[in-house]
Amino acid sequence: MIARSLPLQRLARKFCLVVSLTSILVHFGGANGLYAAQAQQPFAAFNLKVEIDIEDGEVEVWADFTLGAGSNGLDLPNESVSLEVKGGTGAYSVAIPAGSFKKDGSGRFTFQGTIDRVKLEASIRPLRDGAFEFEVETEGANLKGFANPVTVNLTIGDDGGSR
């Protein structure tokens, strides 16, 4: 498993992570038992920003990514979306089941709901030529124990990235 942990800068009671990558060669899985999804096709590019508010149980992730050359594309009606954010002794992970995202008139896929007592709002929007934008915001997650450095894993179907 290759996963790169990046230091964070503490801003009040929030952690903030900004990552800009042009290429990623990663294969990851459930080595720690928290992350069950396994990406077989690494993202070709993965840019990421994360904010964590421990006291309010909020995790916000903004990412844009480009599918790798071997990808068969995204099929959200038939593929689940898994996200894991961990650091220190804290971890938050969620799997949004296949078919949960609904497509709107602009081509954006959105999900609003509650999973494991945590409120979630998520969206995936196609940009251009295999590039996508991903956003998620949680409310009410147990984020006790979070500390630097933080690692983020995102998997959509068999495509994914880790930082």
Predicted regions and their residues:
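N-terminal secretory signal peptides that target proteins for export/translocation
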Residues: 1-12
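Generic preference for hydrophobic/aromatic residues in regular secondary structure cores
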Residues: 1, 29, 50-52
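Bacterial N-terminal signal peptides
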Residues: 14-30
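Short, intrinsically disordered, low-complexity terminal segments
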Residues: 9, 28, 33-36
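Extracellular glycoprotein-like low-complexity segments
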Residues: 35-163
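A composition/secondary-structure signal for short, hydrophobic, low-basic-content segments
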Residues: 5, 23, 34-36
